Amino acid sequence: MSFIEEFINKGYFHQCTDLDRLTTITKETKIAAYIGFDCTATSLHIGSLMQIMILRLLQQHGHKPIVIIGGGTSKIGDPTWKDEARKILSKEDIAKNAEGIKKSLSKFIKFGEGESDAIMLDNAEWLDSLNYLDFLRDFGSYFSVNRMLTMDSVRLRLEREQHLSFLEFNYMLLQAYDFYYLSKHYNCSLQLGGSDQWGNIVMGADLTRKISGKDVFGMTTPLLTTSSGAKMGKTAAGAVWLNEDLLSPYDYYQYWRNCEDADIVRFAKLYSELTQEELNKFESLAAEDINSAKKQLAYELTKLCHSEQAAKSALETAVKIFEEGQIDENLPIVVLEQEVLQAGISAYELFHEAGLASSKSEARKLIRGKGAKINDRLVEDENMIINTTFLLDKNVIKLSAGKKRHILVRV
């Protein structure tokens, strides 16, 4: 199966500037393709997982993935589908975030000097040195303001009479210039992104084609939500991060273990590397035993992101907690100062401090709603004082919020 055929088969395809021509070229030769990532956090989350799997698929087919970190464009902010302007990041924040993003990506793709090895570039390398007058003279005439105003990302802001700064308006020009620069210096012929980036991608392809005459393409993926309409990557407890310093492998496993029944076959197709035969068996399993299918999905995706050992550990921890009622040290751990526990802390404050409630009032609601347990015993008094007498073996206290969120408090 070719790259494009597998791309479509896995459910990644939404739109392409010239699908037939791109299919032919990717069969005949190896290309370089790029995807850009925002520099807004020290890790990517599962909202970017489809794009990451596409980079991985590119590499598996012998094509060269180029990862662009928007160090330059992050200083401006992309207005795409945003109701408000983004916070502008400092150079120090961008550098720190870029390091974390490369860590996320390195779990899935190989960086290096080989022909199909991925490279990571920061568009600040070429955007920071742009002379504004030279840019207007050399490239300004290729952009149509009439066309830019019709793009949904701009049009919606204007229709709602929301502020759209000239700073943000320039983002489209700079992203288009990225494609031209990568085509010229890295022989990049394909830009990939979410469907919300279609207008920006087409502008870049058009600019490159007009100036260089090269065959370049843009291709987008559908914007994913869960079956209930929730945005991928976000939960009530926060983002589902890929880096283990922000989210433990166990919590990553639990996210997929607890996904909605209607999503698991689609997620297996999008995010796992099960063969077609294995996917067929998985679909049959999901129809017969949804919980076993969810365990398999969680295991496969945790193995891909964190390692087979991490997946095994997460599975064993889940079994001990949910099926055997034991305490497992692989649960997420929160450290509490010994003096705090010696003095005593109220139950609702402990749940808030441990991160199982976003506020003290939320912690009170959790306890009043019979959703809080300490050492597997229901907490009925939100003001109950928790002290060192609650410590179990190995100096831990087990906290549970609902049936699926568990952590250990260690002193």
Swiss-Prot record:
ATP binds at residue 234. L-tyrosine binds at residues 34, 171, 175. Keywords: Aminoacyl-tRNA synthetase, ATP-binding, Cytoplasm, Ligase, Nucleotide-binding, Protein biosynthesis, RNA-binding. A motif ('KMSKS' region) lies at residues 231-235. The keyword Ligase applies. A motif ('HIGH' region) lies at residues 39-48. It is an enzyme of class 6 (ligase). Its EC number is 6.1.1.1. Catalyzes the attachment of tyrosine to tRNA(Tyr) in a two-step reaction: tyrosine is first activated by ATP to form Tyr-AMP and then transferred to the acceptor end of tRNA(Tyr). This is Tyrosine--tRNA ligase.
